[in-house]
Amino acid sequence: MDIENNLQDLKKKFSDVERNLENPTNLSQKEFVSFSKEYSELRPIIEIIDEYNILKEEISDLEEIMKDENSDGDIKELAKEELLEKQKIVLPKVKAKLKLALLPKDEDDSRNAILEIRAGTGGEEAALFAAMLFRMYQKYAERRNWKFEPISISNTGIGGYKEASALINGTEVFARLKFESGVHRVQRVPETESSGRLHTSAATVAILPEVEEVDFEIEEKDLRIDVYRSSGPGGQSVNTTDSAVRVTHLPTGIVVIQQDEKSQHKNKAKALKVLRARLYEIERQKKEMERSTMRKSQIGSGDRSERIRTYNFPQSRITDHRINLTSHRLEQIIKEGELDEFIEALISRNEAERLTGGGNVTF
């Protein structure tokens, strides 16, 4: 794709969208929403295009000064310095920004996300770690002014979580959290360990884009839905009605159990939401595998079996193994959800990879 040949088309398209939004009374609600979405997507690109065009004009003016035989020597010298800076430093940066803005976006980046955490190897210590991660993401959601709504939590006897899930609503939730999927490992001395030995435990994190029924339909014939009485720790019944729901997707064998709500209807709705997200993620992974044959991602595929991060408590250290980034702010990250140091680094690495792989976008 020749960028120069597409910039004017994009500016014209943006002008058309602006013109339509200036007269919203002429639009249906659906058209207004569509144009508004298009406007918000195009505006940041147009701003970079304008920056690029202004820079080209400035470079052209400086080149004219250099060519002008009547220009003063001192002025020419200043123009030469400024021209070199703009050509060698400023222009490549603006081109990189523009190239990145024009690369195809992940269509799921704007979606909300479903967080799923499962305790892995390590017994009760792994369950405690899973609960800690769940609270860490809850704190991070609060920092971002996102809504964090627990869907289901399977408790253990001493405060750990065997499994936990939550729906996170807000701006660009999936875009910021999608690189958190994988195996998280903890190294620490358990409070229950009398000998003071260091234990290694793990928990699996999955970040799934939330999808609505209209976006991803599940055939009714592919589902088996069972209802039963919900139970608490130890198996004792906590409800006198059949409110718990188990949904089985027959083609894949995926099972989702939901019993946190007192209403069977609400439990079924939540279970179907989680199932829809899991099935959609399977399709996403298939597409990602196809893309990865063309581009190998250094920050990982989002495979849940991939060990991505280690939390070392004795050294107050967190290391992300995909980008070799280490932070010694373990307590702030775990307790306050100060994850942006890692999330921003992962997003930057992903952008760099996309730029490297975007060879079909040229100036």
UniProtKB/Swiss-Prot annotation:
A GO MF label = translation release factor activity, codon specific
Tell me where it resides: Cytoplasm
Entry-annotated residues carrying N5-methylglutamine: Q236
Enumerate the InterPro entries for this protein: PCRF, Pep_chain_release_fac_I, Pep_chain_release_fac_I_sf, Prokaryotic/Mito_RF, RF-1
Mainly localized where? cytoplasm
PTM section of the record: Methylated by PrmC. Methylation increases the termination efficiency of RF1.
List the SUPFAM superfamilies. Answer: Release factor
Which family does the entry's similarity section mention?
Answer: Belongs to the prokaryotic/mitochondrial release factor family.
Q: What is this protein called?
A: Peptide chain release factor 1
Q: Which organism is it from?
A: Wolbachia pipientis subsp. Culex pipiens (strain wPip)
Identify the taxonomic lineage of the organism of origin: Bacteria, Pseudomonadati, Pseudomonadota, Alphaproteobacteria, Rickettsiales
